[in-house]
């Protein structure tokens, strides 16, 4: 592994780590009011809760993106209703898992680099 290759991959991991960590800082990551039709019923979406987050490999095996899946938060429901936010803990856990996976991948990259030199 060349120094240039190592620097490129390490930089990519660092950027993804920052992105995933930022997602992990809040359960509702995007606030907006939109009308959504769901089974013939309209409701207002006030934000989105992260369901899962996972790093994505490109065809070269580099991690170049993070897939994040959201579920809508319904404004017509009680915002303190535990049922509505029941997945928030698991969502946060999924983001933390994605972050830790990236940290581990980055550490493996460092270890591989030092084995070469």
List the model feature ranges, each with a label.
Residues 6-9, 15, 19-22, 64, ...:
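Charge-rich, solvent-exposed alpha-helical interaction surfaces
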Residues 2-39:
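Negatively charged, low-complexity tracts enriched in Asp/Glu with abundant Ser/Thr
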Residues 28-103:
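Acidic, low-complexity, intrinsically disordered interaction modules
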């Amino acid at each position: 592994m060349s120094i240039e290759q190592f620097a490129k991959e390490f930089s990519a991991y660092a950027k993804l780590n920052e992105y995933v960590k930022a997602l992990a800082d809040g359960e509702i990551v995007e606030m907006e009011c939109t009308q959504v039709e769901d089974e013939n019923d309209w409701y207002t979406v006030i934000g989105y809760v992260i369901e899962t987050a996972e790093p994505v490999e490109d065809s070269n095996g580099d991690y170049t993106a993070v897939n994040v899946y959201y579920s809508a938060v319904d404004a017509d429901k009680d915002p303190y209703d535990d049922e509505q936010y029941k997945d928030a803990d698991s969502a946060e856990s999924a983001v933390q898992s994605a972050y830790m996976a990236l940290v581990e991948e980055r550490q493996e990259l460092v270890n591989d680099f030092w084995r070469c030199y």
